[in-house]
Amino acid sequence: MAPKKKGKKGKGKGTPIVDGLAPEDMSKEQVEEHIGRIREELDREREERNYFQLERDKIHTFWEITRRQLEEKKAELRNKDREMEEAEERHQVEIKVYKQKVKHLLYEHQSSLTEMKAEGTVVMKLAQKEHRAQEGTLRRDMRALKVELKEQELANEVMVKNLRLKHTEEITKMRNDFERQVREIEAKYDKKMKMLRDELDLRRKTEIHEVEERKNGQITTLMQRHEEAFTDIKNYYNDITLNNLALINSLKEQMEDMGKKEEHLEKEMTEVAMQNRRLADPLQKAREEMSDMQKKLGSYERDKQILVCTKARLKVTEKELKSLRWEHEVLEQRFIKVQQERDDLYHKFTSAILEVQQKAGFRNLVLERKVQALVAAVEKKEVQFNEVLAASNLDPAALTLVSRKLEDVLESKNSAIKDLQYELARVCKAHNDLLRTYEAKLLAFGVPLDNVGFKPLDTAVIGQTLGQGPAGLVGTPT
């Protein structure tokens, strides 16, 4: 479009050339066509002029608006400059105030730290003093118990020796008594056996003598009868001549009588033999009874010996039972005394543990609250400081300087917090070591930890591991 405008300006200077021809050389149609093109260009130029006028009006309007906005922004910038100057003044004042507060906080923190250290030192000294006193008391009690135990052992040994001597004397005396009784019983039963044997022999001899006398009497009677019969027979033979038939009859009668007498005598002899056998049977029975009596006497001797041994063992057992009962009573009294001492130690230990736990718990609670308060205050101050920095839009160099100072203050606060945590860990460690020491003492005195009645509290800060270091070292917080 720019060359066409140059062509329009060249019309007034010379004859325009259209399509390589002068207007004079153009035909009517070409001229009309050329005029149509010129009109189209004129319409297009008018449209472009209208468009550029609209653009110019818009640009002018935009320029006016921008100029007014620029003036407004300049006014706002001047206001902001004034506000920044005022904010800078306020910020300087707040920084001075914060510095003063930080100084006060540092002073208060240092004072509280000094007080807590002094307090912890005093408490530790008191606890150590109490611990030493209790340890001395326990050692004295242990020495007294050992001395008493040694005395009781010596007394028991002397008593056992005396009891053994007495027991030996009693056993010897009892043995002599039993031997004497055995000898007396043996002599008594030997005498009884001898008397029984003599009595049985006398009875046997008497019965035999009676039988012999009776048999001798019977034999004498028979001999007398035989003599009488012989005399009668002799008289008969002397008188046979007088009456042979009567004699024969009488002889027959006599022979029959003699046969009867002989049968009677044979029967009597059989009865005497049977009576002898009957007398021999009681003698045999007496002999068997005597052997049975001897066997019974032997079993009686064995039973008597067993009875003697049983009585001796019974007496020994009764003496041992009396001794054991006496020892049981002595041990029971010692047990009651040791139990009372254990109860006293248990009450002392319980009161000491509770007191130490209360002191340590209170001290730990105070330290934790102080640490939490300091951490919360530091976090609050940091948030406020960040808000002030964000609102003040300070120079980067000044911001860096202030940030460095704040970091120094925070670092000092963190170091103070670590010192407090370390001090808290040392106190917890001392408390736990004291608990371990008391538990060891209880085990040394034979008191089970389950009989204490409560579980000692191992102090530790929540979420941290304090006071757990090897070989008495204090663990730092993690």
From Swiss-Prot:
Protein origin, superkingdom: Eukaryota
Positions of region (Interaction with SMO): 357-478
Chief site of localization: cytoplasm
GO annotation, biological process: axoneme assembly; flagellated sperm motility; positive regulation of protein localization to cilium; positive regulation of smoothened signaling pathway
Record bears the keyword Cytoplasm: yes
Keywords on record: Cell projection, Cilium, Coiled coil, Cytoplasm, Cytoskeleton, Flagellum, Golgi apparatus, Microtubule
Region (Microtubule-binding): 115-258
Annotated InterPro entries: GAS8, GAS8_dom
GO CC annotations on file: axoneme; ciliary basal body; cytoplasm; Golgi apparatus; microtubule; motile cilium; sperm flagellum
Gene Ontology molecular function: any one: microtubule binding
Subcellular location: Cytoplasm; Cytoplasm, Cytoskeleton; Cell projection, Cilium, Flagellum; Cytoplasm, Cytoskeleton, Cilium axoneme
Keyword Kinase belongs to the record: no
Basic residues composition bias: residue spans: 1-12
Region listing for Disordered, in residue ranges: 1-31
Subunit structure: Component of the nexin-dynein regulatory complex (N-DRC). Interacts with microtubules. Interacts with SMO. Interacts (via coiled-coil domains) with RAB3B (in GTP-bound form). Interacts with DRC1. Interacts with DRC7.
Family, as annotated: Belongs to the DRC4 family.
Name by which UniProt lists this protein: Dynein regulatory complex subunit 4
Native source species: Bos taurus (Bovine)
Lineage: Eukaryota, Metazoa, Chordata, Craniata, Vertebrata
